[in-house]
């Protein structure tokens, strides 16, 4: 049983008083006892063989209260906020009211809540139709991309002058005011001219030169250069061009078509297949853009009480996005530490990156939740089972492990949000 009392002097905050039933308390105490009994020594008993009754006689059940609380509190708190119908923001401040022996426990939580949402029009919306047409130029550009992918780098004679798009193999030795700096030297480095691999102005000064030449390249490091001791400074790079290589493209003919796609026999067939592939991709992109536009309009039509999203909600979203992103990298074998080392980014950099758009994401989520409530969307047990099966297949997990990792309320929440999006977008019309 829970009781929600809004704060009189502060918006979007209140006190939630709730009970943990005695049966749940007993279960928590039992689990806590099982975790500790192997560490307890009592004369006359081997380690791990002491009974719970004797343990309580010697130490009192209060000795296990904190561990038992840690075990039972998450589910009890979640049930209490569900019963109260509130959406908490951030971590609550929870304190015990009473924890008497043999009785249910009563707790009090000071909770910040999400702001109230006033929905506007969200059904039968009209948004601009998305372009799904595939032009000949689109097909030609894709064929050109495939052609570039089949290109070969061919070594050129020394008389050939370098052009943008060529690759040069160089040695370079950089200095500032005659003093060499870390990272300013390299040997047999392959540099594609025009790629922007080096600082602005470097690659352009190699255009027009030939293999065998020594070239002095004068540049100025950008003011925001990552190495602060070089930022804004003029530098000289002494460069030796060893080799010049130029892309040679294959002929666009039937043989080329067969090389890039074994399922076709002619260039005409490749173009037709490419056109169909692009049409499918464009249709999917148009569908996604249409849905985004519809949801965006529904969000614009709604309003947030106080016109402000709590900072805690934005911070929660940013951390969730970061954890999800780093978790995906972890699945690819890239640890958190490895990512920061490879990318050169810091946690603050990543936080700033995901801060962009966080307020819109949070507001969209709040409005979709309001639509779920307004439309009385309540996923069935069958839908939850289907969701569990889908997640189990996606992550190659057993279904019971999925249920252990994700609460039923969270599963239902995710399903309901998708149902809300579908209801809004299905009712919309492209004009």
UniProtKB/Swiss-Prot annotation:
Its main location: cytoplasm. GO terms for molecular function: peptidyl-prolyl cis-trans isomerase activity; protein folding chaperone; ribosome binding. It is found in: Cytoplasm. The keyword Signal does not apply. It catalyses: [protein]-peptidylproline (omega=180) = [protein]-peptidylproline (omega=0). Residues 165-250 form the PPIase FKBP-type domain. Keywords: Cell cycle, Cell division, Chaperone, Cytoplasm, Isomerase, Rotamase. The keyword Repressor does not apply. GO terms for biological process: 'de novo' cotranslational protein folding; cell division; chaperone-mediated protein folding; protein transport; protein unfolding. GO terms for cellular component: cytoplasm. It is an enzyme of class 5 (isomerase). Its EC number is 5.2.1.8. Consists of 3 domains; the N-terminus binds the ribosome, the middle domain has PPIase activity, while the C-terminus has intrinsic chaperone activity on its own. Belongs to the FKBP-type PPIase family. Tig subfamily. PANTHER family: TRIGGER FACTOR CHAPERONE AND PEPTIDYL-PROLYL CIS/TRANS ISOMERASE, TRIGGER FACTOR-LIKE PROTEIN TIG, CHLOROPLASTIC. HAMAP family: Trigger_factor_Tig. Involved in protein export. Acts as a chaperone by maintaining the newly synthesized protein in an open conformation. Functions as a peptidyl-prolyl cis-trans isomerase. This is Trigger factor. It comes from Leuconostoc mesenteroides subsp. mesenteroides (strain ATCC 8293 / DSM 20343 / BCRC 11652 / CCM 1803 / JCM 6124 / NCDO 523 / NBRC 100496 / NCIMB 8023 / NCTC 12954 / NRRL B-1118 / 37Y).
